[in-house]
């Protein structure tokens, strides 16, 4: 059964994303963040296209079954992380594809479901997992050290008051477990103050915790390099991101792949690498005034796109050294 219209995820920059993807008859495309299927639905309007939809959220996969039935076998849905898109394609007998589109971050559907624990706007269990495995946000809040919590809020949430927030959490959890979104939001609001018209005091802390719980930035790094490997020459990669951390990763990825490398004595395998992407969007595409008026969550969205060249995929760079679930929860 499809989710009701009230909880359907609106594909931000949906028309622009599909325009830059430029699907064509007979092409095979990966919708790496299926959500409510907005991109997939648009791609399937082109006769002869095939879509592999990926989402780590089994609720989204279940919600797409109607579209699968309507697609006459042209849509396949797979529950997986988008960092695994190359393996997913291989499992479907697909070696290379004509395009990959991804909408990075939490979906409106997830934000609007109180039981998922993503939003401070609704009281619910402090969960925040996009999938259904791994540590929940409540478990991280209960177990992480004060220093680790401060790093999580500062690095992933860009919260200037991260140390004060972490200190308040450690003091509060010694008295009562913090297991609901309201409890955490109320606690953060006592430490971080905002003026009328500014974002909610808990916005950055919730963002940082969510990104950490889902390893979102690592996933994005891996998904971009996976897309590079599976795209045919002439295939397109289109990425919509929603905050500066994500956009910086996407921008740097295209910048590195969009120019020839002269090599590095630190990474000899990079010698004489030719550009693996031609950058299509010299500047990010942003939503129109009409779209942001209809969907305020779109206001921070940025779209970047590139076209795969015939050059070999560039070697995968090491992931940045930032807090991970394995390192933080392993220190309990």
Curated annotation (Swiss-Prot):
Q: Mind telling me which InterPro entries this protein's record contains?
A: RsmH (IPR002903), SAM-dep_MeTrfase_MraW_recog (IPR023397), SAM-dependent_MTases_sf (IPR029063)
What is its subcellular localisation? Cytoplasm
Q: Which GO terms describe its biological process?
A: rRNA base methylation
Molecular function via GO: rRNA (cytosine-N4-)-methyltransferase activity
> What is the enzyme's class at the highest EC level?
transferase
Give the EC number(s) under which this enzyme is classified: 2.1.1.199
Q: Region annotation Disordered: residue ranges?
A: 281-332
Keyword line: Cytoplasm, Methyltransferase, rRNA processing, S-adenosyl-L-methionine, Transferase
- List the catalytic activities from the record: cytidine(1402) in 16S rRNA + S-adenosyl-L-methionine = N(4)-methylcytidine(1402) in 16S rRNA + S-adenosyl-L-homocysteine + H(+)
Task: Spell out the GO cellular component terms annotated for this protein, sorted alphabetically and separated by semicolons.
Answer: cytoplasm
**Where, in this chain's numbering, is S-adenosyl-L-methionine bound?**
37-39, 55, 82, 103, 110
Q: Which HAMAP family match?
A: 16SrRNA_methyltr_H (MF_01007)
User: What does the protein in this record do?
Assistant: Specifically methylates the N4 position of cytidine in position 1402 (C1402) of 16S rRNA.
Similarity-based family: Belongs to the methyltransferase superfamily. RsmH family.
Q: What is this protein called?
A: Ribosomal RNA small subunit methyltransferase H
Say which species the protein is native to: Rhodopseudomonas palustris (strain BisA53)
